[in-house]
Amino acid sequence: MWDIIIAAGWPIWPLIATSVFGVAIILERFWSLRESYVIPQNLMEDVKKLVGSGSIKRDAVEALRANSPLGEIMAVAIENQNSSLEIIKDSIEEAGSQVSYKLERYLGALSTISTVAPLLGLFGTIIGMVELFSSFTSSGHDVAVFARGISIALYNTAGGIVVAVPAMIAFRFFRSKVDHLVNEMEQQALHLVEIMRGCLLYTSDAADEEDSVDLGGRRII
Protein backbone atom coordinates (compact mmCIF):
# COMPACT_ATOMS: atom_id res chain seq x y z
CA MET A 1 0.00 0.00 0.00
CA TRP A 2 2.78 2.40 0.91
CA ASP A 3 4.50 1.65 -2.40
CA ILE A 4 1.33 2.68 -4.24
CA ILE A 5 1.15 5.93 -2.30
CA ILE A 6 4.78 6.68 -3.12
CA ALA A 7 4.22 5.84 -6.79
CA ALA A 8 1.12 8.07 -6.92
CA GLY A 9 3.12 11.08 -5.74
CA TRP A 10 2.04 14.02 -3.61
CA PRO A 11 -1.27 14.62 -5.49
CA ILE A 12 -2.66 11.45 -3.88
CA TRP A 13 -2.61 12.96 -0.38
CA PRO A 14 -5.66 15.21 -0.86
CA LEU A 15 -7.51 12.14 -2.14
CA ILE A 16 -6.45 10.14 0.92
CA ALA A 17 -7.66 12.93 3.23
CA THR A 18 -10.95 13.08 1.32
CA SER A 19 -11.41 9.31 1.55
CA VAL A 20 -10.78 9.31 5.31
CA PHE A 21 -13.34 12.08 5.75
CA GLY A 22 -15.82 10.17 3.59
CA VAL A 23 -15.38 6.93 5.52
CA ALA A 24 -15.89 8.80 8.80
CA ILE A 25 -19.17 10.28 7.51
CA ILE A 26 -20.39 6.90 6.26
CA LEU A 27 -19.70 5.19 9.59
CA GLU A 28 -21.31 8.04 11.55
CA ARG A 29 -24.44 8.01 9.37
CA PHE A 30 -24.75 4.23 9.58
CA TRP A 31 -24.80 4.56 13.36
CA SER A 32 -27.05 7.63 13.57
CA LEU A 33 -29.64 6.44 11.03
CA ARG A 34 -30.37 3.10 12.67
CA GLU A 35 -34.11 2.61 12.53
CA SER A 36 -34.08 1.20 16.07
CA TYR A 37 -32.65 4.55 17.23
CA VAL A 38 -34.65 6.96 15.07
CA ILE A 39 -37.99 5.16 15.46
CA PRO A 40 -37.94 2.90 18.54
CA GLN A 41 -40.37 0.03 18.20
CA ASN A 42 -42.39 0.54 21.39
CA LEU A 43 -42.26 4.32 21.52
CA MET A 44 -45.82 4.87 20.27
CA GLU A 45 -47.23 2.54 22.92
CA ASP A 46 -45.33 4.43 25.61
CA VAL A 47 -46.65 7.74 24.27
CA LYS A 48 -50.22 6.41 24.26
CA LYS A 49 -49.88 5.44 27.91
CA LEU A 50 -48.32 8.80 28.75
CA VAL A 51 -51.09 10.77 27.03
CA GLY A 52 -53.81 8.54 28.43
CA SER A 53 -52.53 8.84 32.00
CA GLY A 54 -53.83 12.41 32.23
CA SER A 55 -50.90 13.36 34.44
CA ILE A 56 -47.78 14.15 32.45
CA LYS A 57 -44.69 15.20 34.36
CA ARG A 58 -42.03 17.44 32.90
CA ASP A 59 -39.36 14.81 33.53
CA ALA A 60 -41.31 12.29 31.46
CA VAL A 61 -41.52 14.71 28.53
CA GLU A 62 -37.80 15.49 28.70
CA ALA A 63 -36.99 11.77 28.85
CA LEU A 64 -39.15 11.25 25.77
CA ARG A 65 -37.39 14.11 23.98
CA ALA A 66 -33.97 12.59 24.70
CA ASN A 67 -35.13 9.10 23.71
CA SER A 68 -34.89 9.43 19.93
CA PRO A 69 -35.55 11.78 16.98
CA LEU A 70 -39.15 10.57 16.88
CA GLY A 71 -39.33 11.18 20.62
CA GLU A 72 -38.45 14.84 19.99
CA ILE A 73 -41.53 15.19 17.79
CA MET A 74 -43.76 13.36 20.26
CA ALA A 75 -42.51 15.51 23.15
CA VAL A 76 -43.38 18.72 21.30
CA ALA A 77 -46.85 17.40 20.54
CA ILE A 78 -47.44 16.45 24.17
CA GLU A 79 -46.27 19.86 25.36
CA ASN A 80 -48.99 21.39 23.16
CA GLN A 81 -51.70 18.83 23.90
CA ASN A 82 -53.96 21.40 25.53
CA SER A 83 -53.80 23.62 22.45
CA SER A 84 -55.99 23.41 19.38
CA LEU A 85 -55.43 20.70 16.81
CA GLU A 86 -54.02 23.23 14.37
CA ILE A 87 -51.39 24.32 16.88
CA ILE A 88 -50.55 20.68 17.62
CA LYS A 89 -50.10 19.96 13.91
CA ASP A 90 -48.01 23.10 13.39
CA SER A 91 -45.76 22.20 16.32
CA ILE A 92 -45.32 18.67 14.96
CA GLU A 93 -44.43 20.00 11.51
CA GLU A 94 -41.88 22.41 12.96
CA ALA A 95 -40.30 19.72 15.13
CA GLY A 96 -40.34 17.34 12.17
CA SER A 97 -38.43 19.85 10.04
CA GLN A 98 -35.75 20.17 12.70
CA VAL A 99 -35.45 16.40 13.08
CA SER A 100 -35.30 15.94 9.30
CA TYR A 101 -32.46 18.47 9.14
CA LYS A 102 -30.54 16.48 11.76
CA LEU A 103 -31.06 13.23 9.86
CA GLU A 104 -29.68 14.83 6.68
CA ARG A 105 -26.57 16.09 8.45
CA TYR A 106 -23.30 15.48 6.55
CA LEU A 107 -25.11 14.10 3.49
CA GLY A 108 -24.25 17.28 1.61
CA ALA A 109 -20.58 16.75 2.46
CA LEU A 110 -20.80 13.16 1.22
CA SER A 111 -22.30 14.35 -2.06
CA THR A 112 -19.52 16.93 -2.37
CA ILE A 113 -16.89 14.24 -1.85
CA SER A 114 -18.38 12.15 -4.65
CA THR A 115 -18.11 15.18 -6.94
CA VAL A 116 -14.72 16.51 -5.85
CA ALA A 117 -12.83 13.19 -5.74
CA PRO A 118 -12.76 12.68 -9.54
CA LEU A 119 -11.59 16.27 -9.94
CA LEU A 120 -8.76 15.66 -7.49
CA GLY A 121 -7.93 12.52 -9.44
CA LEU A 122 -7.93 14.55 -12.65
CA PHE A 123 -5.62 17.08 -11.02
CA GLY A 124 -3.21 14.26 -10.17
CA THR A 125 -3.48 13.03 -13.74
CA ILE A 126 -2.50 16.46 -15.06
CA ILE A 127 0.46 16.61 -12.67
CA GLY A 128 1.54 13.19 -13.90
CA MET A 129 1.25 14.26 -17.53
CA VAL A 130 3.30 17.39 -16.85
CA GLU A 131 6.02 15.27 -15.27
CA LEU A 132 5.77 12.81 -18.15
CA PHE A 133 6.36 15.48 -20.79
CA SER A 134 9.17 17.00 -18.76
CA SER A 135 11.09 13.78 -19.35
CA PHE A 136 11.50 14.69 -23.01
CA THR A 137 14.55 16.74 -23.91
CA SER A 138 16.39 17.60 -27.09
CA SER A 139 18.79 14.76 -26.42
CA GLY A 140 16.11 12.14 -25.78
CA HIS A 141 14.01 11.31 -22.75
CA ASP A 142 14.50 10.06 -19.21
CA VAL A 143 12.75 6.69 -18.95
CA ALA A 144 12.54 6.84 -15.14
CA VAL A 145 10.86 10.26 -15.16
CA PHE A 146 8.57 9.13 -17.98
CA ALA A 147 7.49 6.04 -16.03
CA ARG A 148 6.94 8.07 -12.86
CA GLY A 149 4.73 10.52 -14.74
CA ILE A 150 2.57 7.68 -16.06
CA SER A 151 2.41 6.16 -12.58
CA ILE A 152 1.25 9.43 -11.00
CA ALA A 153 -1.37 9.98 -13.70
CA LEU A 154 -2.88 6.48 -13.56
CA TYR A 155 -2.86 6.05 -9.79
CA ASN A 156 -4.53 9.40 -9.21
CA THR A 157 -7.16 8.73 -11.87
CA ALA A 158 -7.95 5.38 -10.26
CA GLY A 159 -7.86 6.93 -6.79
CA GLY A 160 -10.44 9.54 -7.72
CA ILE A 161 -12.80 6.86 -9.01
CA VAL A 162 -12.24 4.60 -5.99
CA VAL A 163 -13.15 7.44 -3.61
CA ALA A 164 -16.05 8.87 -5.64
CA VAL A 165 -18.03 5.70 -6.39
CA PRO A 166 -18.51 4.50 -2.77
CA ALA A 167 -19.27 8.07 -1.68
CA MET A 168 -21.99 8.40 -4.33
CA ILE A 169 -23.48 4.99 -3.49
CA ALA A 170 -23.47 5.85 0.23
CA PHE A 171 -25.08 9.24 -0.44
CA ARG A 172 -27.89 7.68 -2.49
CA PHE A 173 -28.40 4.98 0.13
CA PHE A 174 -28.57 7.40 3.06
CA ARG A 175 -30.75 9.82 1.08
CA SER A 176 -33.24 7.01 0.47
CA LYS A 177 -33.07 5.90 4.09
CA VAL A 178 -33.72 9.42 5.38
CA ASP A 179 -36.75 9.69 3.09
CA HIS A 180 -38.04 6.39 4.47
CA LEU A 181 -37.49 7.42 8.09
CA VAL A 182 -39.10 10.83 7.57
CA ASN A 183 -42.12 9.20 5.92
CA GLU A 184 -42.43 6.74 8.80
CA MET A 185 -42.19 9.54 11.37
CA GLU A 186 -44.88 11.47 9.50
CA GLN A 187 -47.19 8.46 9.74
CA GLN A 188 -46.50 8.10 13.46
CA ALA A 189 -47.04 11.83 13.97
CA LEU A 190 -50.39 11.66 12.17
CA HIS A 191 -51.35 8.77 14.41
CA LEU A 192 -50.38 10.84 17.44
CA VAL A 193 -52.56 13.70 16.18
CA GLU A 194 -55.50 11.30 16.04
CA ILE A 195 -54.76 10.25 19.61
CA MET A 196 -54.58 13.90 20.65
CA ARG A 197 -57.83 14.58 18.83
CA GLY A 198 -59.52 11.78 20.73
CA CYS A 199 -58.22 13.12 24.02
CA LEU A 200 -59.35 16.65 23.18
CA LEU A 201 -62.80 15.42 22.21
CA TYR A 202 -62.99 13.37 25.39
CA THR A 203 -61.96 16.34 27.48
CA SER A 204 -64.50 18.56 25.70
CA ASP A 205 -67.31 16.03 26.27
CA ALA A 206 -66.33 15.69 29.91
CA ALA A 207 -66.38 19.45 30.37
CA ASP A 208 -69.85 19.65 28.80
CA GLU A 209 -71.08 16.90 31.11
CA GLU A 210 -69.62 18.71 34.11
CA ASP A 211 -71.58 21.83 33.15
CA SER A 212 -74.87 19.92 33.05
CA VAL A 213 -74.36 17.44 35.90
CA ASP A 214 -73.11 18.12 39.41
CA LEU A 215 -69.97 16.01 39.85
CA GLY A 216 -68.87 17.48 43.12
CA GLY A 217 -66.25 19.72 41.58
CA ARG A 218 -64.26 16.84 40.05
CA ARG A 219 -62.84 17.24 36.55
CA ILE A 220 -62.76 14.25 34.29
CA ILE A 221 -59.52 14.23 32.29
Regions found by a protein language model. Name each.
Residues 2-8, 93-114, 144-155:
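Alpha-helical membrane-interface segments at transmembrane helix boundaries
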Residues 9, 23, 59, 74, ...:
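Residue-level signature of catalytic and energy-coupling elements of molecular machines
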Residues 29, 115-118, 122-129, 157, ...:
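Hydrophobic positions within alpha-helical transmembrane segments of bacterial inner-membrane proteins
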Residues 38-123, 127-138, 173-204:
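Predominantly long cytosolic amphipathic alpha-helical stalk/bundle segments
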Residues 144, 148-171, 175:
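Pore-lining and gate-forming transmembrane alpha-helices of multi-pass membrane transport proteins
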Residues 202-221:
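Single conserved hydrophobic/aromatic residue that forms the stacking wall/gate
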Residues 140-143, 147, 199:
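Extended amphipathic alpha-helical coiled-coil
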Residues 1-43:
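Hydrophobic membrane-targeting segments
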